[in-house]
């Protein structure tokens, strides 16, 4: 069963999200999900099987440029995760369909997502569910710290 998360579901959603993104704790993610519910620019969907949370998906509206798209806003799959014991039964696909329907109801004509370059499972899921690859990029960062003795004002 797929349902749109409400306030009472956010602790479970944050716990599932922390399984997908282990660099974050549920306590860190909970305020983000509360804000998502409040501002209406995104939603979280939960999948339940046999009375237990089996997975979640997070969708948001993106108003900035999204690789490979031509319209705005774009529905964006921020993350989808299904617990191992529930995989292979169409749960992720059902969560995706709920996210797509949510975005379409908000006027989106395109839907997008991303995955890490080395995440073969996610790549296969995206291709299997009708996404086409738009681009591959490598992003770079570096700290902005002045060299010893250097100061610049612009």
Task: Please identify what each model-predicted range represents.
Residues 96, 103-115:
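Conserved GNAT acetyl-CoA-binding A-motif
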Residues 46, 52-61, 76, 81:
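Conserved beta-strand in the GNAT
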Residues 82, 88-101, 124, 128:
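Conserved acetyl-CoA-binding loop-helix of GNAT-fold acetyltransferases
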Residues 70-84, 138:
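Conserved acetyl-CoA binding element of GNAT-fold acetyltransferases
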Residues 25-46:
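Active-site rim helix/loop that mediates acceptor-substrate recognition in acyltransferases
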Residues 14-28:
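Helix-loop element at the rim of GNAT/NAT acetyltransferase active sites that forms part
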Residues 112-122, 141:
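Conserved beta-strand-loop-alpha-helix junction that forms the acyl-donor binding cleft
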